[in-house]
Amino acid sequence: MAKEKKIRADFRKNRADRPRRKDVLRHLDPEELDEQALPRVERVSGKGELSRKRTVRVTGETAEGELPAQLEVDESACRRGRVLSVRGLRSIVLGDDGQVYHCATRRVLMTLDTGLRHAVAAGDRVLFRPVENTNPKEGLIERIEPRHGTLSRSVRGQQQVIVANIDQLAIVVSVDEPPLKPNLIDRLLVTAEKGRVRPLICINKIDLADLAELQPLIGTYSQMGYTVLPLSAKTGFGVERFARALAGRATVVAGQSGVGKSSLLNVIDPTWNLRVRPVSQDTLKGRHTTTNAQLLPLGCGGYVVDTPGVRQFELWDVVSAEVANFFRDIRPYICLCRFPDCTHTHEAECAVKNAVADGRLDARRYESYCRLLADESEDAQD
């Protein structure tokens, strides 16, 4: 059992400043004014306006070595559950009793200064206090258990955890409508490598192209050890293999809008009846049908998380110096460069650039690395 510690955790400052009264003497009669009875100091701000601290319990360490802060709660009055989806300030939680609860989040969890955009994410394991005699059943989330295997992105400089407690990332792209974006695959692969989750590359709508034309792309990723699945939600091609890859795992499905994420999941389990919409013929871009990440239990064990479509994906907590280490094909050449801090872009005697020139390293993948590196360098300067 993990060793428990206690630490002092910071809380966010109150969002609103207390207004200063401008009419404190308006109701007084000047002739009856007793200056001796008036207070000498007006208190403008209380402790709530300052950075607050509270003792929280710490159990063990995360994979990244960060201590997960947990509030002490009365566990005997709580149930355990998993968050199915988050909608605004409410979370849909599947309790350990098999019941679904509509839960609010304890305010102190929302004010913990964690740097996260939202306190709760789909897939979170939580301790919640049920509210008696409510229909539908309601509860209050008291504690969020330590996470592992998260899919996060950067939104306005803050970490947005899209889903937590996963062990597989299914990256869904389409051959056409919308067009295939290998660079988005590479970004999501970096996210998977960073989060230590197994990536699964799913190429949907292969009925719109000749499979032979995709072999160079499929071969590039397969040689690096990635599993690549050509699929068609329309014809059912490859869907059985996709279902076997999901069985018994906690998988998040991510990709652009319109690539057919929800359509593929509907083929696997029609009872989910996920909403789908055709691609816009004007822009050739997908339309959002999934607005919140939602957890869907699988009958064969495990679960999948359908996520809203992404057109751009900004990496979270990846510095430019780390990017090359998350490219499996570039990694073997890093130690062969002349300079230990080589960025593999302009330096002399760079083993990575030499491998590209000799054809040992895919040129498109190298261009994708350079583009991602430039994006991360710009973010670091902002």
List where the protein language model places each region.
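C-terminal effector/interaction modules appended to NTPase cores
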Residues: 1-193
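Helix-rich effector regions associated with P-loop NTPase G domains
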Residues: 1-52, 74-77, 115-125, 130, ...
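A generic structural motif
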Residues: 88-89, 98, 136, 248, ...
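Conserved beta-strand/loop subsegment of P-loop NTPase cores
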Residues: 166-173, 195-204, 225-230
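Conserved hydrophobic/aromatic pocket- or pore-lining residues that grip, position, or stack substrates
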Residues: 192, 246, 264
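Canonical P-loop GTPase G-domain recognition
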Residues: 198, 207-259
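A conserved segment at the C-terminal end of the G1
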Residues: 261-277
